[in-house]
Curated annotation (Swiss-Prot):
Positions of transmembrane segments: 37-57
UniProt family annotation: Belongs to the cytochrome P450 family.
Enzyme class name: oxidoreductase
Entry's localization field: Membrane
Cofactor(s) annotated in UniProt: heme
Primary location: membrane
Pfam families (alphabetical): p450
Induction description: Expression is induced during the early biotrophic stage of development. Expression is positively regulated by the ABA cluster-specific transcription regulator abl7.
Glycosylation sites: 24, 174, 218, 283, 307, 441
Keyword line: Glycoprotein, Heme, Iron, Membrane, Metal-binding, Monooxygenase, Oxidoreductase, Transmembrane, Transmembrane helix
Protein's name according to its UniProt entry: Cytochrome P450 monooxygenase abl5
Domain of life: Eukaryota
EC code(s) of this entry: 1.-.-.-
């Protein structure tokens, strides 16, 4: 990598000297002749540079040249586009299956940059757990968060800053706090089911159909805001302002998608090239969004007894660790991280149940045997959701199996902070490291020959007692390092709100299955994954629903 930088520095230096040379040529004839010579020279330099990057360095100089290497997909850009493909994990899974390896696969990205894909539990454990702070988030991700949120957030911080921030953010994310919010999650799940019941419309064949994805997004957004900002947000005028502004910058339109991609990978001046005024709109909306959250928090702080609040925002504020800017930025970051991944996880679990009616029926029978029907409709607040939902083995099995096969974030990547090693192989500073939950969660090494199959029964059964109805949190994975099941990653940088997300999905799935029998509206539809940050069904999830009779 050092030799590459040296070569590039020489290239830029030569180009600068040529430019200076041209500026100091006075006669037209000399200028024309010299320009031709210079252009030929530059062309030769570019050709040599390409040969060096594409052939000489990777084959004869790179310290990673002895590792199993994927054949280049395209000249000079390699597997670079795979970072933006809708089904990001599938290409890496093909790579891991096709190339014999012992935990590391080398592949090339844009401009022949070297990347590593981790495939073994030992390699993943080394990067995510043992030496997690030796591998940092990409610069583009930090630029994206800083640009939108205005201050450093937990997800983009590194080293001591990350450790200290997580230490002071952790208290409201422990299991006891989540159990307090379970009743709220259940209440939101019941309201979502009510909305679904009201929204189903007759199709041309008089079949009741609705897009569950839309309802999931709205319900998750409502639940996340309630968990973050407390009950007061429900009736606050700031709620609608925050929702409106958040939608304006995360609405998913083509220009917003282009904006975030360019923010992450290109200089800021390129943002002004996007037509339609998206740069000014995002800047203005981001500023107004931060101001609205700040104003709401100031109101809360001024209330008597606010220090007794159990919502996340006030607990973080009362820690006295975060500045006002950091508090606002981290709360908005938690909103971004909590909405789409949770909604996407729920939708994928629902999709699997729609195409596997036998498991849908098993979940429904389990619910009927353990939960009175009135808790699904008339009396949701009296239901002890935490203790009951977490104790249902089949419900937990289908949730975990859906997350295993369709993790909301199918790939994640890190950058080597300095020269280091992985599994004893030298890795230069700046090398991009890819961890793919999509690959690990479907690895035959971890899950056996049925790794690619939907089989919630793998999460059921206790080998010691022989009881088949007991929930098995390992799912029968042949690894004890947790690296075979990575829907929320692992180690110090594991998603801080993972137990919140799982509790919410559990409640939403239970309520949906308890209220409706459902199947795909179009049984021939091929479900395609889509999304830059989160993987979700392209075009939503349209289901045909029938209300479940009272029991």
């Amino acid at each position: 990598m050092d030799s590459v930088r040296t070569f590039e520095a020489c290239f830029l230096s030569t180009a600068a000297e040529i430019t200076f040379f041209l500026k100091n040529i006075t006669t037209t004839g000399n200028r024309a002749q010299s320009t031709k010579v210079v252009l030929n020279t530059l062309t030769a330099i570019v050709v040599v540079w390409i040969c060096y990057r594409a052939v000489i360095y990777p084959k004869f100089i790179s310290s990673l040249r002895h590792l199993p290497t994927a054949k280049r997909k395209y000249p000079l850009i390699g597997y670079g586009p795979a970072q933006f493909a809708n089904s990001r994990g599938e290409l890496f899974l093909e790579m891991a299956k096709a190339i014999p390896n012992e935990g590391l696969i080398r592949f090339h990205g844009f401009l022949e940059t070297e990347n590593l894909l981790l495939t073994s539990p030992e390699a993943i454990q080394e990067v995510l757990v043992k030496n997690s702070y030796n591998f940092i988030k990409p610069r583009g991700a930090k630029a994206l968060f800083d640009r939108f949120l205005g201050s450093e957030v937990l997800f983009a911080s590194e080293g001591p800053n990350h450790r200290n921030s997580k230490k002071h953010m952790q208290p409201p994310f422990n299991l006891s706090k989540v159990k307090i919010l379970y009743s709220m999650f259940w209440d939101k799940a019941v309201k979502m089911s009510d909305d679904i019941g009201r929204s189903v419309i007759p199709s041309e064949k008089e079949i009741l159909v609705t897009d569950v994805d839309m309802h999931a997004h709205n319900a998750t957004l409502d639940a996340v805001m309630r968990a973050l900002f407390g009950e007061k947000i429900e009736k606050s005028p700031y709620k609608h302002e925050i929702l409106r502004l958040l939608d304006s910058v995360l609405g998913g339109s083509w220009d917003v998608t282009a904006y975030f991609m360019m923010t992450a990978f290109l200089p800021l001046w390129t943002l002004k090239l996007i037509p339609g005024g998206i740069n000014d709109r995002v800047n203005f909306s981001s500023y107004r969004l931060r101001q609205s959250v700040r104003a709401f928090l100031n109101e809360r702080k001024d209330e008597s007894g606010s220090n007794k609040s159990d919502d996340i925002a006030m607990e973080m504020a009362n820690s006295d660790y975060f500045t006002d800017d950091e508090l606002v930025a981290n709360l908005l970051g938690l909103m971004m991280a909590g909405i789409e991944p949770t909604a996407a996880g729920f939708v994928w679990i629902a999709w699997y149940l729609a195409i596997h009616p036998d498991w849908q029926t098993k979940v429904r029978n389990e619910l009927k045997a353990n939960i009175a029907h009135r808790f699904f409709t008339d009396d949701p607040t009296s239901f002890d959701a935490a203790s009951v939902l977490e104790s249902l083995p089949i419900l937990n099995a289908v949730c975990n199996e859906g997350l295993r096969l369709k993790p909301p974030a199918p790939t994640s990547n890190r950058i080597a902070k300095f020269d280091t090693t992985i599994l004893g192989h030298p890795v230069k500073a700046g090398t991009r490291i890819f961890i793919s939950p999509f690959v690990s969660n479907r690895s035959e090494e971890f899950w056996g020959l049925t790794a690619a199959m939907y089989d919630p029964s793998r999460w059921l059964g206790d080998q010691k007692s022989g009881r088949k109805e007991v929930y098995n949190s390992r799912g029968g994975a042949a690894t004890s390092t947790h690296c075979g099941f990575l829907p929320f990653l692992h180690g110090p940088r594991k998603c801080i709100g993972s137990i919140y997300a799982q509790a919410e999905m559990r409640a939403f799935i239970a309520c949906l299955v308890g209220r409706f029998e459902f199947e795909m509206a179009d049984k021939e539809e091929e479900m395609i994954s889509a999304g830059i940050l989160t993987s979700k069904p392209k075009g939503g999830l349209k289901l045909r629903l029938h209300k479940v009779k009272k029991w």
